[in-house]
Amino acid sequence: MKWKDIKNVRGLRSIGTIGSSNIIGTAITSVFWIFIAGLIGTDSYGELSYFLAIIGISSVIASVGGGYTMQVYTAKGVKIAPSLYFLGIIASTIAAIVLFVIFENFGVSISVIGIVAFNLILFEILGKKLYKKYFKIFVAQKILFVILSFAFYFVFGTIEGILVGYGVSMLLFSQIIYKSFKNNKVNFSLIRERIKFLSHNYIAELSATARNNVDKLIIAPLLGFSFLGNYFLGLQVLALMLIIPGIVFKYTLPEDSSGESTGKIKILTIIVSFFIMLLGIFVAPLVIPIVLPEYATAINLIPILSLVVIPRTIYVMITSSFLGQENSKYVVIGNIITFGVLVTSIFPLAELFEITGVAIAYVIAFSSSTTYMIAKYLQLRNKNQ
């Protein structure tokens, strides 16, 4: 692909707007997480990641499949936002109460409500293709997250304060939900007419979240919070490497939903991700000992975890195509494959290689599901030709 062809790829300007917000926002939060890692130590850092996994799973359960459903149907011009907001508020409030009874941690509860509300807001904005507004809100939330988390951490003196700041930083944008209720009425018939896609999408989100968090829930009782802290740091580095695929996905999903061509930008994303993977393998292990010497175990994990960058990038690009066509069942199957392979391989590999075995299981799991997604995508494309 020549440079003049790259410049003419449709959507690069919009991706640049989304991308700059994600890069700035991720840079802000990554510096925060790295600083916190050194401040609270490996055990507390592992405990924090354990609670974040619980929050992540609970928030997806409470979102009732509203995330990508919001983005896809908003892009199609359907006034479904108030109904999804209403369901999300009720479900997340119930989840927050249950979690407080179990853990007696206010930060966990408020974070669940905040994530559900804020994610729905972002998905609505992306569905409307208001990329500049997305930039402002996304970056502002990250700045507030850092400021409030530090403030509440020193007030509470525990990681609960960090989680309180996390939740409050997202709830501060709830006036957008109020405006949505004011402009359009709740209409559950819009949901009933699309219940099949909603339910499939709900299962897809649940399976994806279980896939992304089950490893942390297993590591904590199996190897302890100290090992989990090192593993979580490795995942933070991986998250940095996956910024660009995530950016492109946020652009391509509404475009795929509208029937626009996104093939060139997806191929370009995979090429760029290859070079990012090389940085993770060869550069990151040299930097971590200098910045966080107490996280020595993470040095061995990062090169292994970096190998998953290409499979995950391909997976995300194909997921955009499937969801844009309202065909989420293959995404669900892919997530189930990842979950199943990860759970079945993590125990024997962890027993043999401890935390390094968990990283190996992670790579095997995502490579397996990506292989399935590629095969299914090619099968459907050949069938439609």
Language-model features, listed with the residues they occupy:
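Hydrophobic transmembrane helix module of multi-pass membrane transport proteins
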Residues: 86-203, 307, 311-316, 320, ...
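Signature of the first transmembrane helix
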Residues: 7-64, 199-226, 342-347, 362, ...
